[in-house]
Amino acid sequence: RKEFYVIYAFDGVFDYYSRRLFPRITEFESKLRSLIYMSLINNHGLSWISETIDKIDYELDESNKIKNVLMRNSNGSFNIDTALQNFTLSTYEKFLFTKYSDRSYEDIVNDIEEHYTNNILDDYSLHYILMQKEKKSICHRYIKNINEIKFKSLFKKILKIRNKVMHGKEVTLKDYNENTGVISTSIFLIESSIEVYMNNEY
């Protein structure tokens, strides 16, 4: 019976820290979603899904494709306004950090052949065409004033603690203190990037 009360007390402590972290994690996700919408609409307008998700999915195997998550979480119905609301945090990770190219190999080859046929293939044009095949992530392309490597590291830590909180796992005082700082830093970076777009500093 004594052991039972000890376990019960520790469960209460873990629950306390989880409840304290949950609003901050929710705030992080909300601000992240706002930043992504803002950056994608600014760069791609209403075609942002075809310009990003479709190209990212090309790099992923069938079980990890983002559109599969969207279809499952939205009961088969989503649009440009609601798509991100159906993302899980792990989906955001794939969306932000998976590297993809703007054009397929077939497009690149066809473009080179067309330039060659029209006798306009020089070193500059060849370099320009090939550069379009370079793979870059959403974070690298569109998220302003944020170092991709640093943000990816912070994101992984938030994903880890988020899973512990959501699944009722042990959350200690050390977890709470460390991740409060991680989340605060991440939110600050996101807000700074949003401010760039709000002020049209791009």
Task: Place the predicted regions along the sequence by residue.
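Amphipathic alpha-helical interface elements
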Residues: 1-160, 164-202
